[in-house]
Amino acid sequence: LDLSLDIIEAVLSDKSLNGWDGFGVVVQAYGKRALYVIDWLHAIAKKYNRKIMVRLVKGAYWDTEIKRAQIEGLGNFPVYTRKDLTDCSYIYCAEKLLNLSDRIYPQFATHNANSVAMILELSDKKTPFEFQRLHGMGEVLHRLILERENVSCRIYAPVGPHRDLLAYLVRRLLENGANSSFVNQLIDTSLSASEIADDVFITSKIDSNKKTKLLKPSDLFLPDRINSRGWDLHDMNDISEINSSRNVFKNHEWNIGPEIISEVTGIEKIIIRNPANYEDIVGSVIYANEKDTINSIN
């Protein structure tokens, strides 16, 4: 994420973009940093006098994020582990985008009627924004938006060769075909209309009292053992902790030699340098000669 933000700032700072409002960014609401990313985007747009488009989505790489956190033994997951919390995050992010419309043009990508209704309620009818849907999905909902609310709707249609589109289409199929997805719930005859239309802010509080089935990455192998701890090098808090531990030895030189009873006779001291920064002298080492070896054995 930090690398992406650095690239985005570098592009927005380019003076050749002066007067152009076509730059767009996607924010994924399932990320726990989503609200902070929106604040950052607004600050950068203001800094360089830009107007940018921000497309808000729920997020399409949940499985990958969860698996990576487990493999790397991170302290916690970077994304919400429950769908209802992601739905709540989406609305909070939507409200923030609407309130920052002086520098941001909000684009809400959703097929969820609950999300649409809440966004329409939050909007002041004066702030320009749009809804978005995938080609072939959410057609009825977005047609109603156009007819009743007179709000712009954009169709997101991927274009390209089969080998490039297949992976993308499979991800969309898995995302929208999940049992918990709004689109899938609509055709589930076992669910009543009231269940589908439940307020996510109420259901999330109810579900928070239930024990989650998804263990933290550190608890993945319990009760047998604790998962080996990893470090998220994209997390500034983790990097800060690593640097704090390293700073204790910042000016320390490691000088070593053979550990034998008698005095070391080898006099050649080899300077050891940091291979990543050759000017950084880590320390020195004195290698044992033949006499030192004999003394050690004796």
Identify the residue ranges that each predicted region occupies:
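Active-site capping/gating regions of soluble enzymes
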Residues: 4-186, 195
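Terminal low-complexity tails and localization/encapsulation signals of metabolic enzymes
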Residues: 159-160, 164-167, 171-298
